[in-house]
């Protein structure tokens, strides 16, 4: 079926109507099709990818109409432009489907953050460590922030010892992505990644 068929004696080339809201919107197509192609001659490719040579645009449109397909301009910058006979609606559907599948296959890594203090008590430490192990086992990246307040800034070694303790407790299930060498602002950050 032709993509640019006349509907109620109007072409739906660029202006289309949203059925749910009834509002008009303008869709932008990446490819010119059928009568939109302004070149006088085109390099024509058939349905199965067979090269049909350089033909006048009228003949190319006639061949596409004969097969009840669309003539789609694939490469407008080449001389003469490359056009292919295909079902444009099906082409857009398959392209959209493959884009959705690629997005679905992408692995999204979420970063979870847990805040510590240099003098975090053992009970709080165990609870936070349990949360860290749960996040790492679920495949999430973990950011550990160690915040310093007031005179705690003088005791950097206590903070570094705390981060080393966290690393040693989680070494079976995680690996270190970045370990802080210095205090940035009033905090040190450690990033752990789950082992694969």
UniProtKB/Swiss-Prot annotation:
Subcellular compartments: Cytoplasm
PROSITE patterns the UniProt entry points to: IF3 (PS00938)
Listed GO MF terms: ribosome binding; translation initiation factor activity
SUPFAM superfamilies noted in UniProt: Translation initiation factor IF3, C-terminal domain, Translation initiation factor IF3, N-terminal domain
Pfam families registered for this protein in UniProt: IF3_C (PF00707), IF3_N (PF05198)
A single BP term in Gene Ontology: ribosome disassembly
Signal peptide (residue range): none
GO CC annotation: cytosol; membrane
Keywords per UniProt: Cytoplasm, Initiation factor, Protein biosynthesis
Main location: cytoplasm
Biological role: IF-3 binds to the 30S ribosomal subunit and shifts the equilibrium between 70S ribosomes and their 50S and 30S subunits in favor of the free subunits, thus enhancing the availability of 30S subunits on which protein synthesis initiation begins.
Protein family according to the UniProt entry: Belongs to the IF-3 family.
Assembly mode: Monomer.
Protein name: Translation initiation factor IF-3
Native organism taxonomy: Bacteria, Pseudomonadati, Pseudomonadota, Gammaproteobacteria, Enterobacterales
């Amino acid at each position: 079926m032709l993509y640019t068929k006349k509907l109620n004696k109007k072409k739906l080339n660029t202006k289309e109507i949203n059925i749910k809201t009834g509002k008009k919107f303008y869709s932008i197509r990446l490819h010119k099709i059928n009568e939109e192609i302004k070149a006088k001659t085109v390099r024509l490719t058939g349905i199965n990818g067979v090269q049909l040579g350089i033909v006048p645009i009228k003949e190319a449109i006639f061949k596409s109409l004969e097969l009840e397909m669309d003539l789609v301009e694939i490469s407008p910058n080449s001389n003469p432009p490359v056009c292919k006979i295909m079902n444009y609606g099906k082409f857009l559907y398959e392209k959209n489907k493959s884009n959705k599948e690629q997005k679905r296959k992408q692995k999204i890594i979420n970063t979870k953050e847990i805040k510590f203090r240099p003098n975090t008590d053992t009970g709080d430490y165990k609870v936070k460590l349990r949360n860290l192990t749960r996040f790492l086992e679920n495949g999430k990246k973990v950011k550990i922030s160690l915040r310093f307040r007031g005179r705690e800034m003088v005791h950097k070694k206590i903070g570094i010892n705390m981060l080393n303790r966290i690393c040693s407790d989680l070494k079976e299930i995680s690996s270190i992505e970045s370990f802080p060498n210095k205090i940035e602002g009033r905090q040190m950050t450690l990033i752990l990644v789950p082992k694969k």
